[in-house]
Amino acid sequence: SQGWAPKKEEVVLASKVELEGPVALPRHYELPIDGRLPDYLVERHISPDLAKYFDLRYCVEGKHAYVDPYTDQVKGQVFDMRILIPVYDLDGVMKTFQGRDITGAAERRYLFPMQLPASGKFLYNGHNAVGKQTVVVCEGAFDVMGVKRAIFDEETLRDYVEPIGTFGMHLSGNMNEDAEDQLGAFLTLKARGLRNVIMMWDSEKQAIRNTMSAARRIASLGINVKVACLGEEGLDPGDATPEQILKAYYRAKPYTKQLELLAKIKGIAALL
């Protein structure tokens, strides 16, 4: 008799977290617009599904309104021609956002809204990591998106691994779970099932020092930590191919004091 292979369900990349947005964003379009994205995102290999997953918006002309603490006047901070990147806490509540210039002509590539909390208090995409066993720690939002794309393509990792971002190469906070900071967020994730952390920060020589000290702090929370390296100095996950990211993921080395020492001497070679 003829056996029929079961029809493969097509898996769609989508977040299951209900988002709340008390933060008023500058005037914007939700993405995608009629299935399309600004060229800037297309060039960075961001698909419409990814743009939706990360709740990206497009501000053509818009201002962030804030009260100047010195004059008590309401002012407007211009976010024209920027991709708005909302930042959520672990409960999916929007706390702040970033605006990434897409023209290449702006004085500042990233703009941060005045009078809102610093993004460095939060783990970017942390709300999608709640309940996952493993997180990949990246620096910037586009690094997180690059890793998400790679992991989503890898069926064995898809449901268990989530990338998160620290907005730079240091972790905020101390060992207090109630505090609104990054280490507190790691403790909360641990309480919700997080077991493994893979560090995928930039691999320049100075950067490895920062990576190791962050790895040490996370390991001290009782979490398994591995250190990954993309293999090329200065390459970050936002610019790497999915193959490079997965290779780095599988090749990551468990953090030990010895590895930290070796990295001080040999730099990136210690991680390859």
Regions picked out by a protein language model, each given a short descriptive name:
Residues 146-150, 175-176, 208-212, 238-240:
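A short acidic (Asp/Glu
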Residues 62-193:
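Phosphate-handling DNA/RNA-contact segment within nucleic-acid enzymes
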Residues 209-221:
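Short, aromatic/basic amphipathic alpha-helical patches
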Residues 137, 194-206, 229:
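Acidic beta-strand-to-loop metal/phosphate-binding motif
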Residues 41, 92, 199, 237:
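A residue-level signal for conserved active-site and pocket-lining positions in enzyme catalytic cores
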Residues 166-168, 224-234:
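A generic structural motif
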Residues 177-187, 236-251:
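Short, surface-exposed amphipathic charged segments that create phosphate/polyanion-binding patches used
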Residues 2-84, 88-91, 127-130, 219, ...:
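TOPRIM metal-binding catalytic domain and adjacent DNA-binding surface shared by DnaG-type primases
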